[in-house]
């Protein structure tokens, strides 16, 4: 087993070693390079398939393989790689290839040596194929960008050590891959031939085969295919031959090159010819006054011809990658990213090898090469001991030198010889060692620091002054060079300046230069400035001498002037300097190093449009824009303000025109991907990218398509597709439901305003698309402009007059008066104004510049609309304010239509002529309908009356007939009965009479008995009668039998007897039926009552309740929706509707009073399951549900029926309920209070509900009522006595808006009392521990405490909630003006003190606003550290609102400057400030201040209207500015400009934010033009925007609060008797003194040292303190809640109702209390902490959560 495992391990190790070997990796990468298929494969396949003969095929393969081998060799061999990589070397290789191709295609054989073997290697076709495949391998990187697979070898070559082995193995791998590839292609071709996919016997009409035709035209097809592939790849790369050449800016040193003698002579000849032409007699021509005759241009032209051929063909400095050009005005050109001259290298020093960063690179590389090849250059390694000895010796020498220097310096200081040389020895550069002639300190290169002088950092010259900079910049002072040449101190050979001027100095006679003449020349230069100096007056010779000047001397003189002038003048803008400045410039140029820079300085297309440079010279692409000229130099505007430049020069006409024009830029809104790219640069090489979407953000490679999120059509996940299919199926089933729901939602959600906005947005988008389409098509603007002008002419002079004629002729035919004059007047009123492409108005006659290329618009002012008739009505002088002004203009389209905006797709009404006719027809039809309706109405009413009368009459007749018939029937029946009775009586025998009488009596008796009252007696009687009847019947039967026996019966008697028997039977049957009916009736009467009850209940439950529920189900959401709609309409915000009204989920609340008042079913509320909303209703409801022994529940009836807070509870209820439950007793004073960490309320909850083990139904009862929930959510309720910050703000509680006044005051007082009572009731403490909670117990001493309602609370908290504030409310928030510090004190502490003295309040923390308690106490304790300014930070509030300052009778001083709302609560309109809009009518009034100039007046006006603004400068045009530009262009052309501008401003056509034209007087702010250094002069637009800043008090205010909290406890100390009662501070710095109150003095005397700890409960209000305590008590992990008094209970130590403890126990108590305080906040739950954070900072987000986190782990000071 061990042997097998060993073998396996060795095999795995061997396999891994083989896999990681260089040979295998090289084979792999070489095989991968076969996939980098290029154009060379096309020639190889062509030779293998088309060429005949094996020699051609072999030559193609050998050429292909040799080319690939040379490429692999070039990877390792650098010179070969450079030769094949550079473009000019490839062109050298391409020329012989073209020759081979030319000779190969010709039919002649040029290399025919008489050898007849066609397959010989001397055959030219074989050589051509070989070189063709060889050279196209080299062209592969040129035509195709380098492939990924080809780069594998280059990348891995740097990683391996044995590079030669790697290259050979990769080449072998490439050969293997190549053979596989070729065999695979052959296999494919054989399969195609065998399957007869290409048939050779297909005939065409010309009876030619396809293959033969293909073979003949194969070469042409191949050439076309090769050309297409090259074009495809060259489209991605700009070709180097035809790329745009960039303009070069010559470097400063190029001009000062050496000039040959012949060049100077040619220059002189040119000067002579020019002088002869000009016939100028002066000897010295001016050099600076006429720049075109300057000699420097000749040198520039000459230097252009001296460029090498390679730079002309291929510029190596060109931008060959998509670099972005970053402009920098401080530099001329971009610095090249080249290799530095210095390199880092190690060198041994002081026994150690150190790195030198300034080591020459060539030396380091040479040294490495020599070390590898020659053994002499190998450095012997020095041992460690030798190196250490050497370094120690050198260090000792250094130490000695330093100590000696220090000693000498101290000696010199003692001698009081102080100089710079004492403190530092410097090395100086010397000219002569014997005489010790040193260089000057400025020119000495060995000196450092301020001795060398300071170089002023200046900006480089601009692009316009480049030529002057080149011509005037001098590196060498040539006059100084002459003096140096004459001096004997410096040799000629060592002088570099002399060598540069040696050739120029040979051309003239040096004897002419006398020193006096030179000094005269210099003095003249020094007196006058160079710019105003005329050099034609200069003479080098004195006036008293007369020298005959030959032609040669004149030429020499000119050369002298040239050289000397160049030597002296340093800059045109500066005066000539002394020798010191010249020497300084020389030495700086010698020391400074030339920085390699690109020779290009690029300009944008926008700068070209702006006129900063000549046309067609831009090198960087910018956003597509066109220059739209608004005003030209012929206009009155330029002449009026003296800006018209009437220049006579004809050369710079374009520049002068641009200066005298006012133009704007019009940008196209198309997507521009070429922005800021240099022209001629290579684009991104993205060959292997695929786009499969219509709009795709990023381009991806197809290799990574699996990792990209794809659409459904490109995904292969079957599970997802099945899901989508099922969803579609469900959607098809529920299609009808979706339609109904969608229809309802659209009706409810969509408003008409949104639809209008959408329509406007769609129209605007269509307009932009049409405009861009016209702009993108070639020659479209020309066609459009011509069509517009033709349409204008046709409309004005053909179409409209013809319509007028037709209309008036028709009127004549209809016998109406024609309206020739009216129509002619309207036609004459119509005018056509030419506008730019964007619609900027010019004039009627003036066309915009380049309107054929840039585009044009034609605006029709007062367009003519043909009317069927004209109205003659007197116009009313009064106009309605709300009526909108009709637009009396339109734009003309190409089709001759009228459009409101240019390029709009919705034309105006074409049939406006028929509109009044249709209106008249509608009126007539309405009148006819009204008349017919009245007639039909009357007719229908009359007809109804007639029908009613007829029906009533018919009914009456029918009733009378029926009544008569009934009477007759009744009469006949009576008669019939009487007749039969008479017959029966006549023929009746005696016995039968008796029997019948008995029967009749029985019947009458039985009937009467039934009607009797007693039912039992009646039953007995009926039974007796029945028995009697039976007896009678029996007797009758016996008698009949006897008669039959006797035979005495007669026939008549038999007939009568039969009749009597039948009658008796009938009577019996009727009797039986009557009895049955009577029994049923009796039963029904008994059960009717219960049945009716049951029936009514069923109807009520099944029918009536359902009917009642239907309107409730439908009405309730309807009412709530109407409420929401009204709320939205009032506030204009959807969020308020969600805040104020939350619907009740229950629909039919059939519940009791308790359930109705104390159960809240709003489960969707965010306060659900929240303990913080425990209310009194919850307590009483749970008390009622709990079982209590010996308690009368009816005592709580009043509490339960009262649906709001019952603030005061009677003692009986307290004792019975609270005492039984263990909460508290009413007589708290006389009992021992349980001073526990967990209060009694928590104990009660814990005992009954086991902390959090509550059901959902119980948790649902923890919510308070709806109105209280809203109040706690939105803060303080409304009260007229409250000091409000924002008087315009409206309370979101719309329901309670009617309850303002006295009722609302009472409710707030009750609520405040209840808060205080509940807090003191639940969180009581004795006097000793009262500092923990910051209050006094309510039940200790002052029972009759009165809570004042005249407390000042702010409507908004200190830390306002910003998330739900609408932007209109937010912009009117308080913003502090930092610039002005007014002396107004917003807190009058003296007034507060007076109020305190007047009131008898034991606890000042509750009448004062609860949030300010801690700050007030802090300032009262130590007012020296914390001023009022830090506490409240009220500086000057620059707010535009109506100040309603309430006067106080007790105090005559003016109160706080905080703006209070008036009692009427007037709705103040807000001033909405929009971008680019001017001044609007404002309802606010501020007192005007006296301002000195007009500038300040207008700025004050802006400040007053817009409150906060800043000047924003943009290059684009907004709608409002564009509208102002239109109006402004028309106003400029008018004569009376001032009146028209005022009128246009009054009409609202022109805003006050119009643009400021450059170098002109401003119409709105004339003071701005006086300021020279104003930024407004640089830009051309002036925009006013409202500042979207957060409030200034947030940041500083929060910081001050947090810092003040820490300062409070640091400065707490004992108050001695010596402590001053008043602290006087300077009033100007917002400090004031505070007097101590009487209550405070008492507390200060009894105050002891307390732990230096911030109590978090002091931050909260009374209600929120209760919330905090409840949350802490309900926290399940709070195990420290031990009853504190259980340990220390001792009855003997109880004295007068309070517990006395020893000092030790007090210390223990303090420690426990400290532990409680420390673990109070950290043990708190994060959710609860966030809730408290939201309440305190009044916000919904956690942005200020970090401030609360400060109090999590505070620093505890232990006494």
Swiss-Prot record:
Query: What residue intervals traverse the membrane?
Result: 23-45, 64-84, 129-149, 172-192, 221-241
Cystine crosslinks:
none
Q: Provide the membrane topology annotation.
A: Multi-pass membrane protein
- List GO BP terms, alphabetically: protein transport
* A single GO cellular-component term on record: chloroplast inner membrane
Q: What is an example of a Pfam family matching this protein? A: Ycf1
Main location, first listed in the record: plastid
Q: What is its subcellular localisation?
A: Plastid, Chloroplast inner membrane
The alphabetical list of record keywords is: Chloroplast, Membrane, Plastid, Plastid inner membrane, Protein transport, Transmembrane, Transmembrane helix, Transport
InterPro entries per record: TIC214 (IPR008896)
Fill in the subunit field for this protein.
Answer: Part of the Tic complex.
Q: What does this protein do?
A: Involved in protein precursor import into chloroplasts. May be part of an intermediate translocation complex acting as a protein-conducting channel at the inner envelope.
**Stated family:** Belongs to the TIC214 family.
Record's protein name: Protein TIC 214
């Amino acid at each position: 087993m061990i042997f097998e495992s060993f073998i396996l391990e060795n095999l795995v190790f061997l396999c891994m070693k083989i896999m990681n070997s260089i040979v295998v990796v090289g084979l792999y990468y070489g095989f991968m390079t076969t996939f980098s298929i290029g154009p060379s494969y096309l020639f190889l396949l062509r030779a293998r398939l088309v060429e005949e003969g094996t020699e051609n095929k072999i030559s193609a393969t050998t050429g292909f393989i040799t080319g690939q081998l040379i490429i692999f060799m070039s990877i390792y061999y650098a010179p070969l790689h450079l030769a094949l990589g550079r473009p000019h070397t490839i062109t050298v290789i391409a020329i012989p290839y073209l020759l081979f191709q030319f000779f190969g295609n010709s039919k002649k054989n040029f290399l025919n040596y008489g050898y007849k073997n066609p397959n010989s290697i001397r055959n030219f076709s074989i050589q051509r194929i070989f070189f063709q495949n060889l050279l196209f391998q080299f062209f592969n990187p040129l035509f195709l960008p380098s492939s990924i697979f080809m780069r594998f070898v280059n990348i891995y070559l740097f990683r391996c050590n044995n590079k030669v082995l790697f290259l050979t193995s990769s080449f072998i791998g490439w050969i293997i891959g190549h053979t596989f590839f070729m065999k695979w292609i052959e296999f494919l071709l054989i399969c195609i031939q065998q399957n007869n996919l290409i048939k050779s016997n297909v005939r065409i009409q010309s009876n030619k085969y396809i293959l033969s035709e293909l073979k003949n035209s194969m070469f042409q097809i191949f050439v076309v295919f090769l050309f297409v592939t090259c074009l495809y790849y060259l489209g991605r790369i700009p070709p180097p031959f035809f790329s745009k050449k960039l303009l070069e800016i010559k470097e400063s040193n190029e001009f000062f090159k050496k000039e040959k003698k012949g060049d100077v002579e040619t220059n002189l000849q040119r000067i002579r010819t020019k002088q002869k032409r000009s016939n100028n007699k002066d000897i010295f021509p001016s050099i600076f006054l006429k720049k075109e005759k300057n000699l420097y241009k000749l040198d520039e032209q000459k230097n252009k011809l001296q460029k090498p051929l390679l730079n002309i063909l291929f510029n190596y400095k060109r931008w060959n990658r998509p670099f972005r050009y970053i402009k920098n005005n401080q530099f001329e050109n971009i610095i090249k990213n080249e290799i530095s001259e210095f390199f880092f290298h190690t060198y041994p020093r002081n026994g150690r090898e150190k790195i030198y960063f300034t080591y020459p690179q060539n030396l380091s590389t040479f040294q490495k090469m020599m070390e590898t090849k020659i053994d002499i250059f190998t450095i012997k390694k020095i041992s460690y001991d030798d190196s250490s000895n050497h370094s120690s010796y050198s260090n000792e020498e250094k130490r000695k030198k330093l100590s000696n220097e220090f000693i000498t310096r101290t000696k010199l200081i003692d001698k009081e010889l102080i100089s710079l040389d004492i403190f530092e020895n410097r090395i100086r550069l010397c000219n002569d060692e014997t005489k010790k002639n040193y260089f000057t300190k400025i020119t000495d290169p060995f000196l450092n620091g301020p001795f060398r002088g300071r170089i002023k950092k200046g900006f480089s010259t601009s692009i316009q002054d480049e030529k002057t900079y080149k011509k005037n910049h001098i590196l060498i002072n040539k006059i100084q060079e002459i003096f140096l040449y004459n001096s004997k101190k410096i040799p000629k050979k060592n002088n570099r300046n002399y060598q540069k001027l040696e050739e120029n100095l040979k051309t003239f006679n040096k004897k002419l230069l006398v020193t006096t003449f030179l000094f005269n020349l210099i003095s003249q230069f020094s007196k006058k400035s160079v710019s105003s100096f005329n050099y034609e007056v200069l003479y080098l010779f004195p006036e008293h001498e007369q020298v005959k000047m030959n032609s040669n001397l004149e030429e020499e003189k000119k050369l002298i002037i040239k050289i000397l002038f160049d030597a002296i003048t340093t800059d045109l803008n500066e005066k000539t300097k002394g020798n010191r400045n010249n020497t300084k410039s020389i030495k700086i140029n010698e020391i400074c190093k030339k920085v390699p820079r690109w020779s290009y300085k690029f300009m944008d297309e926008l700068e070209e449009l702006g006129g900063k440079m000549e046309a067609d010279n831009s090198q960087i692409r910018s956003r597509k824009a066109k220059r739209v000229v608004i005003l030209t130099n012929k206009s009155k505007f330029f002449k009026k303000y003296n800006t018209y430049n009437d220049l006579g020069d004809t050369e710079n006409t374009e520049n002068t025109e641009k200066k005298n024009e006012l133009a704007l830029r019009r940008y196209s809104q198309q997507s521009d991907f070429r922005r800021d790219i240099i022209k001629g640069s290579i684009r991104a090489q993205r060959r292997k990218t695929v786009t499969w979407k219509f709009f795709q953000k990023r381009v991806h490679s197809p290799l990574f398509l699996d990792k990209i999120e794809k659409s459904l059509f490109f995904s292969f996940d079957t599970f997802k597709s099945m899901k989508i299919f099922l969803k579609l199926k469900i959607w098809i089933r529920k299609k009808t439901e979706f339609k109904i729901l969608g229809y309802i939602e659209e009706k409810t959600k969509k408003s008409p305003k949104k639809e209008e906005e959408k329509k406007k947005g769609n129209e605007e988008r269509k307009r932009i698309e049409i405009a861009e389409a016209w702009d993108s098509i070639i020659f479209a603007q020309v066609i459009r402009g011509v069509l517009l002008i033709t349409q204008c002419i046709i409309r004005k002079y053909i179409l409209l007059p013809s319509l007028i004629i037709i209309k008036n002729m028709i009127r004549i035919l209809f016998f109406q008066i024609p309206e020739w004059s009216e129509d002619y007047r309207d036609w004459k009123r119509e005018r056509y104004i030419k506008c730019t492409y964007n619609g900027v108005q010019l004039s009627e006659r003036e066309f915009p510049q380049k309107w054929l290329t840039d585009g044009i618009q034609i605006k029709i002012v007062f367009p003519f609309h043909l009317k069927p008739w004209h109205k003659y009505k007197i116009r009313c002088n009064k106009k309605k304010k709300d009526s909108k002004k009709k637009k009396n203009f339109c734009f003309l389209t190409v089709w001759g239509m009228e459009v409101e905006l240019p390029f709009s797709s919705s034309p105006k009404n074409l049939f406006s002529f028929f509109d009044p006719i249709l209106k008249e027809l509608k009126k007539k039809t309405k009148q006819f309908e009204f008349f017919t309706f009245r007639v039909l109405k009357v007719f229908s009413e009359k007809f109804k009356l007639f029908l009613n009368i007829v029906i009533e009459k018919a009914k009456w007749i029918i009733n009378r007939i029926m009544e008569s018939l009934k009477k007759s029937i009744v009469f006949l029946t009576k008669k019939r009965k009487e007749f039969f009775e008479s017959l029966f009586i006549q023929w009746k025998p005696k016995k039968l009479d008796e029997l019948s009488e008995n029967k009749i009596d029985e019947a009458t008796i039985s009937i009467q008995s039934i009607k009797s009252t007693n039912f039992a007696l009646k039953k007995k009687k009926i039974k007796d009668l029945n028995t009697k009847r039976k007896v009678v019947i029996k007797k009758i039967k016996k008698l009949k039998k006897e008669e039959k026996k006797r035979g005495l019966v007669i026939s008549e008697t038999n007939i009568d007897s039969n009749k009597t028997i039948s009658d008796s039977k009938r009577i019996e049957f009727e009797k039986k039926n009557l009895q049955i009916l009577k029994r049923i009736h009796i039963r029904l009467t008994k059960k009717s009552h219960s049945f009716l009850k049951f029936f009514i209940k069923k109807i009520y439950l099944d029918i009536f309740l359902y009917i009642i529920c239907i309107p409730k189900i439908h009405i309730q959401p309807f009412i709530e929706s109407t409420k929401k709609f009204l709320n939205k309409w009032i506030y204009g915000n959807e969020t308020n509707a969600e805040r104020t009204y939350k619907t009740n989920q229950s629909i039919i609340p059939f519940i009791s009073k308790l359930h109705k008042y104390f159960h809240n079913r709003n489960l969707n509320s965010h306060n659900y399951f929240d303990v913080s909303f425990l209310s009194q209703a919850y307590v009483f409801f749970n008390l009622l549900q709990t079982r209590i022994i010996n308690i009368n529940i009816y005592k709580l009836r009043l509490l339960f029926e009262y649906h709001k807070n019952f603030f005061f509870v009677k003692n009986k209820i307290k004792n019975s309920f609270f005492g039984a439950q263990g909460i508290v007793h009413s007589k708290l004073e006389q009992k021992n209070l349980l001073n526990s960490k967990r209060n009694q309320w928590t104990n009660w909850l814990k005992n009954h509900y086991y902390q959090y083990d509550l059901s959902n139904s119980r948790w649902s009862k923890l919510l308070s009522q709806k109105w209280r929930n809203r109040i706690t959510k939105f803060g303080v309720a409304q009260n007229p006595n409250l000091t409000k910050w924002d008087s315009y703000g409206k309370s979101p509680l719309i329901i309670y808006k009617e309850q303002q006044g006295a009722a609302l005051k009472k409710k707030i007082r009750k609520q405040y009392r209840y808060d205080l009572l509940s807090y003191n009731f639940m969180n009581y403490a004795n006097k000793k521990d009262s500092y923990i909670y910051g209050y006094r117990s309510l039940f200790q001493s002052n029972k009759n405490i009165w809570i004042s309602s005249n407390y000042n609370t702010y409507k908004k908290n200190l830390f306002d909630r910003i998330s739900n504030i609408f932007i209109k409310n937010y912009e009117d928030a308080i913003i502090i003006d930092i610039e002005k510090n007014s002396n107004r004190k917003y807190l009058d502490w003296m007034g507060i003190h007076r109020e305190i003295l007047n009131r008898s309040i034991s606890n000042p923390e509750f009448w004062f606003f609860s949030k300010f308690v801690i700050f007030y106490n802090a300032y009262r304790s130590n007012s020296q550290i914390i001023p009022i300014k830090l506490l409240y930070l009220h500086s000057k509030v620059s707010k535009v609102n109506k100040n309603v300052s309430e006067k106080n009778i007790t105090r005559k001083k003016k109160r706080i400057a905080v703006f209070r709302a008036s009692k009427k609560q007037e709705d103040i309109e807000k001033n909405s400030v929009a971008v680019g809009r001017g001044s609007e009518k404002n309802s606010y009034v501020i007192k005007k201040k006296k301002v000195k100039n007009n500038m300040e007046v207008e700025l004050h006006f802006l400040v007053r209207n817009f409150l906060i603004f800043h000047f924003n400068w943009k290059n684009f045009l907004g709608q409002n500015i564009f509208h102002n530009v239109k109006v402004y262009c028309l106003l400029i052309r008018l004569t009376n400009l001032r009146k028209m501008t005022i009128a246009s401003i009054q009409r609202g056509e022109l805003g006050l934010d119009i643009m400021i034209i450059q170098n002109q007087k401003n119409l709105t702010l004339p003071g701005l033009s006086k300021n020279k250094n104003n930024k407004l002069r640089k830009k051309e637009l002036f925009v006013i925007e409202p500042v979207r800043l957060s409030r200034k008090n947030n940041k500083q205010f929060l910081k001050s609060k947090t810092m003040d909290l820490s300062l409070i406890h640091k400065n707490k100390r004992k108050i001695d008797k010596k402590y001053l009662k008043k602290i006087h501070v300077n009033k100007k710095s917002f400090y004031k003194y505070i007097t101590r109150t009487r209550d405070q003095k008492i507390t200060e005397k009894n105050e002891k040292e307390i732990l230096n700890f911030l109590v978090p409960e002091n931050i909260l209000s009374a209600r929120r303190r209760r919330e905090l305590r409840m949350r802490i008590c309900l926290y399940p992990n709070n195990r420290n809640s031990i009853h504190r008094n259980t340990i220390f209970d001792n009855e003997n130590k109880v004295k007068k109702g309070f517990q006395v403890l020893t000092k030790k126990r007090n210390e223990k108590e303090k420690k426990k209390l400290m532990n409680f305080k420390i673990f109070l906040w950290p043990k708190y739950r994060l959710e609860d902490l966030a809730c408290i954070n939201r309440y305190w900072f009044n916000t919904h987000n956690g942005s200020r959560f970090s401030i609360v986190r400060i109090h999590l782990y505070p620093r505890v000071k232990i006494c």
